[in-house]
């Protein structure tokens, strides 16, 4: 099925006002986007597993890390650029994989990609996307924006092989293996809402035999059984035998697993608790980064997602040792608010906030950002070093 024939699911459910609200922050954007979505899809994107404790903790944890700016530094020329997957990126910010962008807006993943490509922001495409991986990467007409394809440990390995081959041919730079979801988390809002997707919703990157049934998320989701017997040694070796794309693993939350990932020779890890959507009451990812960075820094690339809402949050992650930060819901909120233009608005907010934070903290380039720019406010209200 071609992209133009894919069903369109309007996100807006009310025409109470034709004027757009003023958006000055990601929190403004979240509210405006949520107002446009139906309850079912708003709860699907905004909610987490069980009691949403991890979801809330991911965001709240940033408030304990306080900025310690250096002054009288030359910040007349701020360079935010870095590299990812062997390609230059505008700043250490990318878009995480999230499924079914067309539930938020008809622009879908192509709309998200268009906004990313215009700003040289890397994007990880979910296997459960509504647009073809070729159309998504095609938004970077000159190939200067790096893309990665996300895969899960599917029991049917031909699904993974097909995705890897297509991604390689389409110029993708990496594959991101999700390792924290051998089964779906218990998401109470989705159960209460009877979550399903519109009839005829398509997943063009998956083989025809997976296109019917329920994959554990709800009605209309492809029947994708996960390999619950997958192990580090066997799975990583098999993935490497199937592709020469960079191999990253997403969903690492233990220093012990970070060490195993290094031993298995992965190119990078993404510290992630799935945005609080899998196992509730896990620690905030920014706190986990503080544990993992001393183990992994200099041995593999370190990225992180979960709870990022401000440019200063990105700064804090870099100061703690992250090479890169990914955001998922923020792109969805932008998409729901105003399609591809809304994604651009979301990214611009973070870009401008990050640049401002660098300047006010006395940093003119990424390598200037160090742990000395942070203090941790402990439970006694006393500032202490982060390392």
Curated annotation (Swiss-Prot):
Disruption phenotype: Does not alter fusaric acid production. Residues 18-379 form the FMN hydroxy acid dehydrogenase domain. Residues 1-20 are annotated as: Disordered. It comes from the Eukaryota. Keywords: Flavoprotein, FMN, Oxidoreductase. PROSITE patterns: FMN_HYDROXY_ACID_DH_1 (PS00557), FMN_HYDROXY_ACID_DH_2 (PS51349). Gene3D superfamilies: Aldolase class I. Its EC number is 1.-.-.-. Signal peptide: none annotated. Induction: Expression is positively regulated by the secondary metabolism regulator LAE1. Fusaric acid is phytotoxic to plants such as cotton and banana. It has been shown to induce programmed cell death in plants. In addition to a mild toxicity to animals, fusaric acid exhibits acanthamoebicidal, antioomycete, and antimycobacterial activities. FMN binds at residues 126, 150, 178, 250, 305-309, 328-329. GO terms for molecular function: FMN binding; oxidoreductase activity. The active site is at 274 (proton acceptor). InterPro entries: Aldolase_TIM (IPR013785), Alpha-hydoxy_acid_DH_FMN (IPR012133), FMN-dep_DH (IPR000262), FMN_HAD (IPR037396), FMN_hydac_DH_AS (IPR008259). Its cofactor is FMN. A 2-oxocarboxylate binds at residues 44, 187, 277. Pathway: Mycotoxin biosynthesis. Belongs to the FMN-dependent alpha-hydroxy acid dehydrogenase family. Oxidase; part of the gene cluster that mediates the biosynthesis of fusaric acid, a mycotoxin with low to moderate toxicity to animals and humans, but with high phytotoxic properties. L-aspartate is suggested as fusaric acid amino acid precursor that is activated and further processed to O-acetyl-L-homoserine by cluster enzymes aspartate kinase FUB3 and homoserine O-acetyltransferase FUB5, as well as enzymes of the primary metabolism. PANTHER family: 2-HYDROXYACID OXIDASE 2 (PTHR10578:SF149), S -2-HYDROXY-ACID OXIDASE-RELATED (PTHR10578). This is Oxidase FUB9. The lineage of its organism: Eukaryota, Fungi, Dikarya, Ascomycota, Pezizomycotina. The gene is FUB9.
């Amino acid at each position: 099925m071609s992209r133009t024939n894919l069903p369109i699911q309007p996100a807006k459910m009310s025409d109470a006002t034709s004027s757009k609200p003023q958006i000055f922050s990601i929190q403004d954007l979240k509210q405006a986007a949520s107002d446009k979505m139906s309850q079912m899809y708003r709860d699907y994107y905004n909610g987490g597993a069980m009691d949403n404790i991890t979801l809330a903790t991911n965001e709240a944890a940033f408030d304990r890390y306080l900025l310690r700016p250096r002054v009288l530094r030359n910040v007349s020329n701020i360079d935010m650029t870095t590299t990812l997957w062997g390609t230059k990126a505008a700043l250490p910010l990318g878009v995480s994989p999230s499924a079914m962008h067309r539930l938020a807006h008809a622009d879908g993943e192509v709309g998200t990609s268009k906004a990313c490509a215009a700003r040289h922001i890397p994007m990880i495409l979910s296997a459960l996307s509504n647009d073809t991986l070729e159309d998504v990467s095609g938004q970077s007409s000159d190939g200067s924006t790096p893309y990665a394809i996300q895969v899960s440990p599917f029991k049917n390995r031909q699904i993974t092989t097909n995705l890897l081959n297509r991604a390689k041919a389409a110029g993708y730079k990496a594959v991101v293996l999700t390792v924290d979801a051998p089964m779906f988390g218990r998401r109470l809002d989705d159960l209460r809402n009877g979550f399903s997707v519109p009839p005829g919703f398509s997943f063009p990157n998956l083989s025809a035999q997976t296109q019917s049934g329920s994959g554990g998320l709800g009605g209309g989701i492809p029947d994708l059984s996960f390999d619950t017997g997958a192990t580090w040694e066997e799975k990583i070796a098999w993935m490497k035998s199937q592709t020469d794309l960079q191999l990253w693993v997403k969903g690492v939350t233990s220093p012990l697993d970070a060490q195993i990932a290094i031993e298995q020779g992965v190119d990078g890890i993404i510290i992630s608790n799935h945005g609080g959507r899998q196992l509730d009451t896990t620690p905030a990812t920014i706190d986990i980064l503080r544990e993992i960075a001393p183990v992994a820094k200099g041995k593999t690339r370190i990225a992180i997602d979960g709870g990022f809402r401000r440019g200063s949050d990105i700064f804090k992650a870099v100061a703690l040792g992250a090479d890169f930060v990914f955001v998922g819901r923020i792109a969805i909120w932008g998409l729901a608010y105003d399609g591809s233009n809304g994604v651009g608005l979301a990214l611009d907010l973070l870009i401008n906030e990050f640049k401002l934070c660098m300047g006010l903290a006395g940093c003119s380039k990424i390598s200037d950002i160090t742990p000395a720019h942070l203090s941790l406010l402990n439970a006694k209200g006393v500032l202490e070093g982060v390392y």
